[in-house]
């Protein structure tokens, strides 16, 4: 495990020395590394499945199909095309340069730094590595510290299978990453969020190092009457809730026209049940949130702003009591500052009456799965369904469990563009559905969003 400026700089210098020796250039060396990389993932399948389960609660099928198989396939794909990609290709020359002849040759860049994320800790570490090795580069891999079991496994296996003089793994956190970014790598490949992406870009600018950023964003799906609603619902549900929604290219939200929006929401809920059963928490195919920080962030995006009990006795009763408690508290404070008395008074009573469920409201829809705790601070009152709530109503899901970092696959219907859930990349199992008139106006709105 490398740590500190000396170790990270020493790692870079050793890789640079190996690259400059010409060791990584021959096609035979590249093919050997790609073959070894393929063996690394196929011969250690069970170990990777276990590490991903420990880090993310990721189902075995997801790890095999969406990580290990893709890495093996990428290694094979680029290996089969090396001769074509490295061949000289004739290039037409300007008439002023005649009778000169020209051609293009694909050259390695040098020492490549790969900073990989936690959500697909094998795929997004080893797939870029396959491409960098195929191009004849030396590689330094910095896996995410948020998936420590997979990071440790990669650090153990990579030197066993690949050329340890040309490929290194540096474990650690932000400190080690920061030290690596001080080194003059020839290319940096970063997968993650925009905040760290900016840090990477600023550091790379010091050395004029080219950078590839694979970032997330708010990628919508648009559905209108021309779509097969059943097919669209199943595809959206699969893309959104795989890996518990922690996929950078997952559908972030849905734009649907009024004639199909409600039916689509219902069909997505049906698809969720087909994929994960009546209780997704008990499903072996549904994952968990990576850590407590992301869990709490996602809970704040739900219509109910406080984390509910894992096994609520009655969602409707708890939502109603939460609103009543919040309104009662507001009433007592109002009376305290206006009359000096601490009772709830008439205002609290009228507020409670005003908060009763009505047909078509979020309150009336609480039976669909919304849950809430019984204690709501006045500052949180806008987060309770039916009270200034912009997130929409919960069609299905909404249940959470802090101990297991579980958030049920959740569909929100009638979400406002101004809701908190629409202000950031969700990166979790929450799917807002916005009702829109057409695609054109929403394309304009999406185009005006900030990049990160």
Residue spans of the language-model regions?
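Conserved small/polar residues in nucleotide/adenosyl-binding loops
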Residues: 446-452
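An alpha-helix initiation/capping motif
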Residues: 31, 35, 65-69, 152, ...
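Rossmann-like NAD(P) dinucleotide-binding subdomain of oxidoreductase/dehydrogenase enzymes
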Residues: 93-231, 262, 267, 273, ...
């Amino acid at each position: 495990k490398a740590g500190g400026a000396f170790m990270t700089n020493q790692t870079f210098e050793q890789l640079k020395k190996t690259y400059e020796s010409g060791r990584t250039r021959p096609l035979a060396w590249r093919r050997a590394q790609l073959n070894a990389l393929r063996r690394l993932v196929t011969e250690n399948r069970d170990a990777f499945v276990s590490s991903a389960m420990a880090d993310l609660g990721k189902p075995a099928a997801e790890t095999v199909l969406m990580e290990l198989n893709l890495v093996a396939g990428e290694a094979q794909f680029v290996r089969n095309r090396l001769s074509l990609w490295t061949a000289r290709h004739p290039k037409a020359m300007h008439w002023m340069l005649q009778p000169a002849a020209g051609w293009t040759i694909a050259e390695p860049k040098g020492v490549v730094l790969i900073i990989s994320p936690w959500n697909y800790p094998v795929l997004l570490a080893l797939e870029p590595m396959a491409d960098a090795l195929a191009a004849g580069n030396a590689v330094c891999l910095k896996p995410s510290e948020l998936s420590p079991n997979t990071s440790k496994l990669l650090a153990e296996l990579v030197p066993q299978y690949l050329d340890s003089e040309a490929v290194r793994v540096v474990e650690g956190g932000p400190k080690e990453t920061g030290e690596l970014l001080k080194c003059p790598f020839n290319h940096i490949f970063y997968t993650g969020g925009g905040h760290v992406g900016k840090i990477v870009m600023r550091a790379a600018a010091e050395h004029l190092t080219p950078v590839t950023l694979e970032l997330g964003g708010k990628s919508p799906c648009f559905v209108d009457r021309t779509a097969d609603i059943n097919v669209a619902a199943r595809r959206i549900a699969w893309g959104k809730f795989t890996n518990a929604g922690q996929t950078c290219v997952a559908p972030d939200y849905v734009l649907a026209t009024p004639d199909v929006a409600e039916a689509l929401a219902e069909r997505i809920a049906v698809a969720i049940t087909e994929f994960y059963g009546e209780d997704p928490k008990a499903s072996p195919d549904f994952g968990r949130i990576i850590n407590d920080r992301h869990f709490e962030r996602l809970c704040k995006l739900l219509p109910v702003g406080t984390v509910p009990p894992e096994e609520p006795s009655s969602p409707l009763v708890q939502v109603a009591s939460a609103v009543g408690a919040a309104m009662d508290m507001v009433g007592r404070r109002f009376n305290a500052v206006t009359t000096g008395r601490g009772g709830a008074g008439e205002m609290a009573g009228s507020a409670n009456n005003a908060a009763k469920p009505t047909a078509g409201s979020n309150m009336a829809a609480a039976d669909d799965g919304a849950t809430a705790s019984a204690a709501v601070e006045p500052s949180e009152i806008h987060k309770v369904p039916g009270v200034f709530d912009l997130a929409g109503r919960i069609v299905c899901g909404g249940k959470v469990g802090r101990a297991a970092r579980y958030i049920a696959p959740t569909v929100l219907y009638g979400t406002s563009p101004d809701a908190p859930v629409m202000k950031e990349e969700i990166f979790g199992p929450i799917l807002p559905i916005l009702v829109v008139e057409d695609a054109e106006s929403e394309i304009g709105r999406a185009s005006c969003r900030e990049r990160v």
